[in-house]
Amino acid sequence: MGLENRPEDRVKVILVPCYLEGNDGIFNLPYYHLLAANDLALYPSYYEPWGYTPLESCAFHTPCVTTDLSGFGQWVDGVLGHEGTLEDGVRVIHRDDSNYMQVAQEMCQTVKDLLNTPSKQRTAIRNHAVSIANKAQWKHFIKYYFEAYNFALSRVYNK
């Protein structure tokens, strides 16, 4: 896919298999500081009921890529009324049991697309990511928790 981690490559792929608390020995930065320093965050979720990490990325002006197998990806598609694109701040890729390589290729292409995006447009993409995060604030979601709570109570008391 062209991501080879050569010295001259503009994109470096790294795996950090630890929790980022600021003393990991690799970055030594707290999670949120590192998150804000990223140009793009990739979350190739195979299954996540919601997925807070893509939302956190958006809240810190970091556009992200996720899949429609995450609740967050499904929610973004619903809010936007179409499959999320890089320009929207959240790229949502279709994922199923048989398209692993296609998902990997689309994620790679999204990274390349962002690298080739002019600075002014990248700023707009970052702002769109924040706009999506703002739509997921508690002031918008709390009513659903109250509805679920009241539904649960009604089931208990109607038995």
Named regions from a protein language model:
Residues 13-16, 34, 38, 90-93, ...:
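Generic structural hydrophobic/aromatic packing signal, biased to beta-strands
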Residues 44-127, 131-133, 151:
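Catalytic binding pocket for nucleotide-activated donors in carbohydrate/polymer assembly enzymes
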Residues 1-33, 92:
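Nucleotide-activated donor-binding/catalytic signature segment of Leloir-type glycosyltransferases, i.e.
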Residues 32-49:
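Acidic donor-binding loop of glycosyltransferase active sites
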Residues 27-30, 99, 118, 137:
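Helix N-cap and loop-to-helix transition residues
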Residues 29, 36, 105-109, 139-143:
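A structural signal for well-ordered alpha-helical segments within the folded catalytic domains
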Residues 138-159:
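C-terminal alpha-helical cap of glycosyltransferases
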